Amino acid sequence: MGEVAVPGRKSIGAKRNPESADAIIEAAEAVLAEAGYSGFSIEAVARRARAGKPTIYRWWPSKAALLIEVYQRQKRLETPDTGKLEEDLAGFLVNLFAHWRDTSSGNVFRSLIAEAQSDEAAAAALADYAKGRRAHTGSMIERAKTRGEVAADVDAEIVADLIASYAWRHLLTNRLDEDETAIRTAVRYVVRGIARA
């Protein structure tokens, strides 16, 4: 079964048609807003986007993969580059906590993490996403290495995992109202541990 014909939009097979992909993501955002995570389904997205389920599954192998793309599209976070690692990481976490707290993205991401505990497709989608995030946060560490702030032998990905674990714990325990001072203290402890002697 192919995509239902929609004027001005056509399927181009396995390669994503940008117009169709946007329509599907917009439909997914709308279904998520109306039905929440528990009421979200590929069937509902397909109906709303007037697209075939096979098209959606060809482009996103699981519900979780589509939801992660929706999450990424909604995520509008500045990545600080102040010239000081402690400021960059603290600013990143403050912005992330506010984004999770003040938008539906926090609930979506929390639900994805929970689903990944029992669903292999969700776990795989989350692992792929985390790999990209690890590299993104790791780039802040690498910049600090270049500036001589951080010891050359520090593994940037491990430090990124430490920062992510702090953030995820607050997300999963619904403690996103953490005081900025506490966030800065946690970051200071991490940075002291990797600082160049």
Regions found by a protein language model. Name each.
Residues 24, 39, 62-67, 76-78, ...:
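Short amphipathic alpha-helical segment with a characteristic S/N-K-E followed by hydrophobic residues
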Residues 151-173, 182-192:
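Hydrophobic alpha-helical segments that form the core
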Residues 94-101, 109-118, 187-193:
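Helix-loop "lid/cap" segments that line or gate small-molecule binding pockets
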Residues 1-39, 43-48, 54, 65:
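Basic, helix-initiating cap at the start of DNA-binding domains
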Residues 107, 120-146, 181:
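Amphipathic alpha-helical packing segments from all-alpha helical-bundle domains
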